[in-house]
A protein has these predicted regions:
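Active-site neighborhood of divalent metal-dependent phosphoester/pyrophosphate hydrolases
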Residues: 8, 12, 40-58, 74-88, ...
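Metal-dependent catalytic neighborhoods of phosphoester/phosphodiester hydrolases
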Residues: 14-16, 47-66, 81-101, 106, ...
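N-terminal active-site segment of His-dependent metallophosphoesterases
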Residues: 1-68, 72
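Context-gated lysine
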Residues: 2, 13, 25, 74, ...
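His/Asp/Glu-rich metal-coordinating catalytic cores
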Residues: 85-193
């Protein structure tokens, strides 16, 4: 199965108060050109679709255009939220999008079920794990103490019923233990880093 993986689009980003939207439109066009050339079975967008939890209208329009173009190309699309994304913003019309094979996992809301695609070699299970934070998952794991992002991710992954005999892809936007955050991560993230 041919996959195209992208992440950290940060649509709507401003650099030194200058909008990068025109540059981002160019990048979206390049992504679409790659899709036209490579014809992937699925496009995986692994978080930080937007640069801010409350994106401006122009950023939302660019994502809308990208989704329309992806739907026209008939590839399956799987999107998860990242720490910069608002789950509420990404979840808008997600059930409607599924009719166009666009699957969006904006927030952890209980055990994750896979999305299964098939190719000439059989089925592939895709597990869409949105960005998880202790505050967003703690209520689902009352018997566990979840103190940090790593424990949140471990709890969520521990609930997945992954069949290791099957081809499996887990799409995530994790917080990496031991990593460092730059100023823009701390300032623009929906959750503190």
């Amino acid at each position: 199965m041919k996959l195209l993986h992208i992440s950290d689009l940060h649509i709507g980003k401003r650099l030194m108060e200058v909008s990068l939207l025109e540059d981002q439109k160019y990048i979206v066009d390049q992504i679409l050109s790659i899709i036209d050339d490579e014809r992937p079975d699925a496009v995986l967008i692994a978080g930080d679709v937007y640069d801010r939890a409350n994106p401006n209208a122009e950023a939302m329009e660019l994502l809308d255009e990208l989704l329309v173009q992806l739907a026209q190309r008939k590839a399956s699309v799987m999107i998860i939220s990242g720490n910069h994304d608002s789950p509420e913003r990404l979840s808008y019309a997600r059930r409607f999008f599924e009719h166009s094979r666009i699957y969006i996992s904006p927030v952890y809301d209980g055990p994750i079920e896979p999305i299964t695609l098939s190719d000439e070699y059989g089925e592939v299970d895709f597990w869409l794990m949105p960005y998880v934070h202790p505050d967003s998952v703690g209520g689902f794991f009352a018997k566990k103490t979840i103190r940090n992002a790593q424990e949140a991710a471990e709890a969520v992954i521990g609930e997945m019923q992954v069949d290791t005999a099957r081809r499996t892809v887990i799409v995530s936007h994790p917080f990496i233990v031991g990593g460092t955050s730059c100023a823009s991560e701390r300032r623009n993230s929906r959750t503190p880093t």
